[in-house]
Regions:
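Acidic, Ser/Thr-rich low-complexity segments on the non-lumenal side of membrane proteins
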Residues: 1-11, 158-185
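Alpha-helical transmembrane anchor segments
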Residues: 81-173
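Short coil/turn segments at secondary-structure boundaries
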Residues: 16-22, 152-154, 174-175
């Protein structure tokens, strides 16, 4: 699920990761869908339903697992909304103009109190506000591959390693380090 979600958010091809993790017939079925990540959730739901019908899962365990699949569906929906909802141009424009206007008028507001220190304080405060404006633009798409984007490869690798370790499947894949400057703490 996590690898497929990563590919969906980055608009890349999930085939290689799916083939590495799943049997070929499942990969073919998943890739035939227009929404592979949703298909994975559906298949997982079908699988736990079959286990329940076969008596291999209790009703309580089935209910808990079904709730977890619902939570994953909510995560998927939230990530899709973040990835596909653009910041309105008017919002970006008003934010930039407000920051520039504030930085332009700031020295006039400070000169009465700070006198000769006004340029230094104004530059420092203006730099901070202009940096926040630039940072907001940089973080608009957190799922990409730019330096300040989320390290999805490292996050998916951590999830995969944890699941394989919990189920006793060894050897574990090599640990991926976070992408670029982002640290997982």
């Amino acid at each position: 699920f996590s690898w497929s979600l990563k590919h969906q958010l980055r608009k890349t091809d999930p085939t290689a990761d799916l083939r590495r993790l799943l049997p070929e017939e499942r990969v073919t079925e998943i890739l035939a869908s227009s929404m592979p990540t949703n298909r994975i959730l559906l298949l997982a739901g079908n699988e736990i339903g079959q286990l329940r019908e076969a008596g291999k899962l209790s009703d309580i365990t089935y209910g808990l697992m079904d709730n977890k699949l619902d939570e994953l569906a909510h995560v998927l929906g939230g990530c899709e909304r973040l990835a596909t909802t653009p910041v309105p141009f008017a919002y970006t424009l008003i934010l930039q103009r407000t920051v520039y206007l504030f930085c332009t008028l700031l020295p006039f507001a400070l000169v009465g109190d700070l006198h000769y220190m006004t340029p230094f304080v104004s530059v420092f405060i203006s730099y901070t506000f202009l940096s926040w404006d630039s940072l907001a633009e940089e973080l608009e798409d957190p799922f990409g591959t730019a330096a300040n984007d989320l390290p999805l490869n490292a996050m998916c690798n951590t999830i995969e390693r944890n699941l394989l370790d919990m189920t006793g499947q060894h050897p574990l894949p090599e640990t991926l380090r976070p992408d670029r400057y982002f640290n997982l703490t």
